[in-house]
Curated annotation (Swiss-Prot):
The keyword Nucleotide-binding applies. Its main location: cytoplasm. ATP binds at G74, P75, E76, S77, S78, G79, K80, T81. Keywords: ATP-binding, Cytoplasm, DNA damage, DNA recombination, DNA repair, DNA-binding, Nucleotide-binding, SOS response. The gene is recA. GO terms for cellular component: cytosol. One of its GO terms (molecular function) is single-stranded DNA binding. The keyword DNA repair applies. Belongs to the RecA family. GO terms for biological process: DNA recombination; DNA repair; SOS response. It is found in: Cytoplasm. This is Protein RecA. CDD domains: RecA. Can catalyze the hydrolysis of ATP in the presence of single-stranded DNA, the ATP-dependent uptake of single-stranded DNA by duplex DNA, and the ATP-dependent hybridization of homologous single-stranded DNAs. It interacts with LexA causing its activation and leading to its autocatalytic cleavage.
Length: 339
């Protein structure tokens, strides 16, 4: 009995010490830098919606955290730029100023508009070198006037010496050093200006790799270290078809591979419609089924014990034409997940 009491007292004492240590760490490194996995304290973090309700829910905090660096990476045509354009539209809805550093020189204004981006208000820069791109990014962050900054992409941030044609050994790892310097400068400023900074990145194959993951993101290790969120987006094999059996889009999985602000390793699945972006109606439909607000029996969709559509595309059309039901479902989903 005496041993049990001693053991219990020791546990209680250790818990108190742990709680005090967590508070000290949060004071030093900021809220969200350390937490218990089942803790809901991270709900207080300020966010900008990702534009995908499924991803907002998976992130656990309702969107991208303000004052943090985020990396979105994945294979070619997986939906990286689409995802960031949705975030831009959401930031603009909140009245924020948004900047897009287009190092790839590939931004499609018509597609951005179709997603909901106000291109008249979007600040755009198309620099011709990596150093210029990162200097412009740092200046915009320092100004404190930008709520969201997107850099597309890390792979296109080419150092000036490479552009000048100097292919010497001294240039090996130059991009990684350039990114490392930028991260050290930007990370401190971002937390003070409360800017959300999104770096889009690409995947490359490791040369001579025989074990483990053969894929690696470009730009060295600094971005991985400094970012608070890393999202891996990939297309699935599933295609989205309309009622005429024509392919109109793809499904993509977004995996949270790193999170300093919530529980990582969750996945969100989104429907990306060609020319339109993420299908919000499709998301509401899927989430409503998860919460049993809508039932599915085979190909039939049922709401309040009545079949209303056969097939997912018809169910989406029904919700599009019945906004009262759509709005009710969205409200219930937001209440459930507190977003």
């Amino acid at each position: 009995m005496e041993n049990n009491k001693k053991e219990n007292n020791k546990k209680e004492n250790n818990l108190k010490i742990l709680e005090e240590t967590i508070k000290e760490v949060e004071k030093q490194f900021g809220k969200g830098s350390i937490f218990k996995l089942n803790s809901n304290n991270n709900q207080s973090i300020e966010t900008i919606s990702t534009g995908s309700m499924s991803l907002d829910i998976a992130l656990g905090i309702g969107g991208y955290p303000k004052g943090r660096i985020i990396e979105i990476f994945g294979p070619e045509s997986s939906g990286k730029t689409t995802l960031t354009l949705h975030a831009i539209a959401e930031a603009q809805k909140l009245g924020g100023n948004v900047a897009f550093i287009d190092a790839e020189h590939a931004l499609d204004p018509k597609y951005a508009q179709a997603i909901g981006v106000n291109i008249d208000e979007l600040v755009l820069s198309q620099p011709d070198s990596g150093e210029k791109a990162l200097d412009i990014a740092t200046s915009l962050i320092k100004s404190g006037s930008i709520s969201l900054l997107v850099i597309d992409s890390v792979a296109a941030l080419t150092p000036e010496s490479e552009l000048m044609g100097e292919m010497k050994d001294i240039n090996v790892g130059l991009q990684a050093r350039m990114m490392g310097k930028a991260m050290r400068i930007q990370s401190g400023i971002i937390s003070k200006t409360n800017t959300v900074v999104i770096y889009i990145n690409q995947l490359r194959e490791k040369v001579g790799n025989f074990y483990g993951n053969p894929e690696v993101t470009t730009g060295g290790k600094a971005l991985k270290f400094f970012c608070s969120l890393r999202l891996d987006i990939r297309r699935t094999a599933e295609k989205i078809k309309n009622n005429n059996d024509e392919i109109i889009g793809v499904k993509s999985n977004i995996k949270i591979v790193k999170s300093k602000v919530s529980t990582p390793f969750k996945t969100a699945t989104v429907d990306i419609i060609y020319g339109k972006g993420i299908s919000k109606i499709g998301e509401i439909l899927d989430l409503a089924i998860d919460l049993n607000l809508i039932k599915r029996n085979g190909a039939w969709y049922n709401y309040k014990n009545e079949n209303f559509a056969q097939g997912k595309e018809n169910a989406k059309i029904f919700l599009q034409n019945n906004l009262e039901i759509y709005n009710f479902l969205e409200e219930q989903i937001r209440k459930k997940y507190k977003i």
